[in-house]
A protein has these predicted regions:
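Conserved alpha/beta enzyme-core scaffold
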Residues: 1-267
Length: 267
């Protein structure tokens, strides 16, 4: 089955109010082309999910597209500092911050992948996050041990950027996979944006190349440069000048223009 779509058609699967997950990690292999198209299509009230998020959340908060963020880390790391537009959204109460640990976000996604309403973990006991986010404690029926129940999160749509994909929906991630394989199994719909569309023989010759199997994929988009200005292993480094230009702007519309985003007039 050919799952190849244009970017606009794939992003149109997202509805206002959806929970949307993104693959990659901070400034590495993030699906930025899809994020920019979400803004062009004027999507609103989105719940964003990612373990460690940076440019995506700032773009979507600057555009007024995000209303809730579930993440373990929000920030650019290193020279770029904090996420300005996310911070402004939280401070103005237009964005709800569900602060997690990275592993609790992974656990929430894994619960959805397993098809269960929650999964227990041990590590948050003694943390203020229990009260801040409203996690529940449960008692193990076998040992009597107190554990923390992490509610499953099943994204309505997830976007992953990969180096190679075929038209059937197999995706190859070169380098760290981060949480992408868990996200792919947790999401109700999965969109792969790919640097390169390859023949299906690329995967049939070596099935281990399929980091993401086609059975999980809803749509594939050919998107060379689709993570820029973030980095993609084996393809390109991050574009620091574009990031600096975006972060230098103090007006949200100017920041979006610096990122090369113009809203569609018919959105």
């Amino acid at each position: 089955m050919n799952k190849l779509l244009e970017l606009a058609a794939a992003v149109a699967m997202v509805n206002d109010g959806d929970t949307v997950a993104f693959g990659g990690n901070v400034l590495y292999r993030s699906p930025i082309a899809a994020v920019k198209e979400l803004i062009r299509q004027d999507k609103k009230d989105l719940h964003l999910v990612k373990t460690a998020i940076a440019y995506e959340v700032d773009l979507l908060c600057a555009a007024g597209a995000a209303s809730r963020v579930t993440a373990g880390f929000v920030g650019y790391e290193g020279e770029f500092g904090l996420c300005r537009w996310y911070r402004k959204g939280v401070e103005s109460a237009t964005v709800r911050a569900d602060e997690n640990a990275c592993y609790s976000v992974i656990t929430a996604l894994r619960g959805a992948a397993y098809g269960v309403p929650f999964l227990p973990i041990r590590g948050m006991l003694g943390s203020d996050l229990l009260d801040a986010v409203g996690f529940r404690k449960v008692t193990c029926p076998y040992t009597g041990e107190e554990l923390v129940a992490i509610r499953a999160i099943a994204p309505d749509v997830a976007f992953l950027h990969v180096q190679k994909a075929d038209e059937m929906g197999n995706g190859c991630i070169i380098g760290p996979t981060y949480e992408d394989t868990v996200i792919a199994r947790a999401a109700k719909k999965l969109v792969l944006t790919a640097e390169e569309i390859v023949p299906s023989s690329y995967f049939s010759e070596d099935p281990n190349r399929a980091s993401i199997p086609a059975v999980l994929t809803t749509a594939v988009v050919k998107a060379p440069g689709g993570a820029k200005p973030c980095a993609v292993s084996g393809c390109y480094d991050m574009d620091r000048e574009e990031l600096r230009a975006f972060l230098a702007e103090k007006d949200p519309d100017a920041a979006l223009r610096a990122a090369g985003i113009e809203r569609r007039k018919d959105a």
